[in-house]
From Swiss-Prot:
GO terms for molecular function: glycosyltransferase activity. Its EC number is 2.-.-.-. The keyword Transferase applies. Pfam families: Glyco_transf_25. Belongs to the glycosyltransferase 25 family. Keywords: Glycosyltransferase, Transferase. This is Putative glycosyltransferase HI_0765. The keyword Endoplasmic reticulum does not apply.
């Protein structure tokens, strides 16, 4: 892969969609669609991802995850306000994770990509992943396609696509941002929702829960999913999480649900448990 590098002054430490590293400006391949968010220190995970994508000869790039030392500067690019006080609802690690996803949405727009596939670095890929990561099978009005098999949903209004898969409208909340596609239309839509606002909710809760309330938000699930997180496949020996300690630290700061919200949430939980079906991985 060809990487263009030019020297720049230090005050341009971080720009979108290019990344300043050791005095150099790293230009991402404008034709690349597959990006894996990963801390530079997570060499075990990076080795796993290189092997996983290599099995199917799938091209990809690592996106160096936003770290706590640059989250303030990165947030300013989008006029996002952060709470890093003792009462913060997100840890610095969770903020960096969310900003990493947001920067990639912006990268898609800046590089005029018609879509971008975003992954986290603990996934396993399923069959026909290479073909299914060429996103030419969803309608033009779709914002987000979830690729990951995670949780239950209602399988209604199926649309048959390639490799014996279907896509279904997502109508109930999901968790996890380990594998999903954002279209150009979706990148613009998501950025408009997060710019000029506080960031106090984890990125997966935004994309696969909070934004579902907007009637014009078009999001679909690929089923069977083509990726799954390591802890789902290997619950007894998963990759160690770099975010869990921070999550535990801010857990007590989360907003308490009202009685009405608790009733509504419980009703939804029972409904999905009784009538929902697990998204399969293949």
């Amino acid at each position: 892969m060809k990487i263009s590098m030019i020297f720049l002054p230090h005050f341009l430490y971080y720009t979108v969609p290019t990344f300043y590293l050791f005095g150099l400006l790293i230009m991402h391949n404008a034709a690349q669609h597959n990006y894996v968010i990963s801390l530079t220190t997570e060499q075990k995970r990076r080795k796993h991802i290189t092997e996983e994508f290599g099995k199917q000869n799938i091209p990809f790039e690592f996106f160096d995850a936003i770290t706590p030392d640059i989250i303030e500067e990165t947030a300013k690019k989008f006029n996002i306000t952060l709470d890093r006080s003792p009462k913060a609802k997100l840890s610095d690690g969770e903020i960096g994770c969310a900003l990493s996803h947001i920067v990639l949405w912006d990268l898609a727009l800046e590089n005029n990509l018609n879509y971008i596939n975003i992954f986290e670095d603990d996934i396993h890929l399923g069959e026909n992943a290479k073909e299914l990561l060429e996103i030419d099978y969803i309608s033009d009005d779709i914002h987000v396609l979830k690729l990951e098999a995670n949780g239950k949903m209602f399988f209604k209004q199926p649309k048959s696509v390639k490799c014996d898969r279907n896509v279904y409208p997502m109508t109930v909340k999901q968790s996890g941002c380990a594998g999903y596609t954002v279209t150009a239309k979706g990148a613009k839509y998501l950025l408009e929702l997060v710019k000029n606002k506080p960031l106090d909710v984890a990125v997966d809760s935004l994309v696969f829960e909070d934004f579902l309330h907007f009637k014009d938000y078009k999001i679909v699930q690929l089923s069977p999913g083509i990726c799954v997180q390591d802890f789902v496949l290997h619950p007894d020996n998963p990759f160690e999480s770099s975010l869990q300690e921070g999550r535990d630290r801010v857990h007590g700061n989360q907003r308490k649900s009202s009685i009405l919200e608790k009733i509504k949430n419980e009703f939804g939980r029972v409904k999905i448990k009784m009538f929902g079906k697990q998204v399969p991985f293949k």
